[in-house]
């Protein structure tokens, strides 16, 4: 595993952990998403600065794009409203959709595979299939130009 790949994988895990926590206690009372991130035990235990910065970039990007990401997830999760999707799966879907749509340097296949790895680690037995189905449909539409962005599969 290359150093960049390992850093990004660990960064995704860290971003996922904080994003998942935010699904229970969203920013409120003067606490910004960034402040919560900086105070998160998972972040304060981490010593690798590049990893912390990458996870922070992901989290803040996801948080600022959450409405659009939820619209995309809702469009591709047939018969599943956002409110019905389990918090683990929703956090993984938001993270992966963000990478698929906004991170030009992450190939579509890599974004999907990394989401499946998160689902294997944190989800239940059905998580990976559910996540793969949604993300594969999103990636196909990105690949065919429906999202007005250009990426490699």
Each predicted region: which residue ranges?
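N-terminal interaction/assembly modules
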Residues: 1-122, 126-153
């Amino acid at each position: 595993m290359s150093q960049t790949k390992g850093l990004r994988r660990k960064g995704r895990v860290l971003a996922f952990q904080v994003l998942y926590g935010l699904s229970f206690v969203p920013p409120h009372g003067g606490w910004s998403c960034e402040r919560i991130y900086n105070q998160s035990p998972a972040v304060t235990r981490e010593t690798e600065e590049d990893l912390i910065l990458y996870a922070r970039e992901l989290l803040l990007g996801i948080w600022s794009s959450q409405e659009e990401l939820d619209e995309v997830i809702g469009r591709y999760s047939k018969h599943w409203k956002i409110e019905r999707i389990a918090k683990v799966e929703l956090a993984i879907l938001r993270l992966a959709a963000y990478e698929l749509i906004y991170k030009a340097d992450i190939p579509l296949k890599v974004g999907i595979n990394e989401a499946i790895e998160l689902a294997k680690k944190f989800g239940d037995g059905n998580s990976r299939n559910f996540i793969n189905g949604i993300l594969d449909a999103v990636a196909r539409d990105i690949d065919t130009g429906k999202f007005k962005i250009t990426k490699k599969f």
